[in-house]
Structures are given as structure tokens and as C-alpha cells.
Amino acid sequence: MLQRDAFIEEITKSLDKDKSIFFLSADFGAQALDELRKRFPSNFLHCGISEQAMLDVATGLALEGNKVFVYAMAPFLALRSLEQTKCGAGLMNLPISLISVGIGLGYADAGPTHYSTEDFACSRAI
């Protein structure tokens, strides 16, 4: 089983028990998310390819007392939305978990815009 699939399986189990969990995604093409999206339409939010806005939505949900998991490709989640992550989840110490796929050169075939060699360094600084 892929790590991603194991993670989604655990999120599904958690959502069965706790409706204060929200799963936000910028990855609309991931078939692995189909079952989660169908079973929990009120707790699964597809934010489109707009990672910065997705982090702002996550901040709002967390401020209302929810636990939020944010899922996207590493270069866009760690780098494009760095300011939102810092000011939302980081400075306010909110229960937002960032889950990324394609770390390092995981999507190297998509070109340099999809490289994520500095994602850990940026995220750890927060």
C-alpha cells in the first residue's frame, strides 16, 4: 500500500468518528481521494489549484475549532503558500496539518516548477 493511500485510509477512519475534521485538497485529479470525497462531502473541500486560498480557508476552519488536513503537491503547498502557512497555522499555533506529495524531485518529469528541494527547510523554519 502506498503511504498516500494508508494516510487517506486513516483520515477516513478518523472522519467516521470525528466530524470536526476537515480535509482540504488542491489535487482534483487524485483518484485516491474519490472515496473520501463521496463519503464525507461536508468535510471534504476541494479548493482548486489555489494553495494560498486553501491555507486561508484552513485557518478559518481551525479558528472555529476544527482539525484541518491540507493536501497538495509539495512545491505549491510548501512554497507558494508559505506566507499563509506562517501567519495562519504557524503564528496562531492552529491545528492544521500540511500533507504533501511529490517532495524533492518527485514530479521532476513535470519540469522545474514542480521541483520541491527546499520544502523541508521552509516548513521547518515555521
PLM regions: where:
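Thiamine diphosphate
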Residues: 1-126
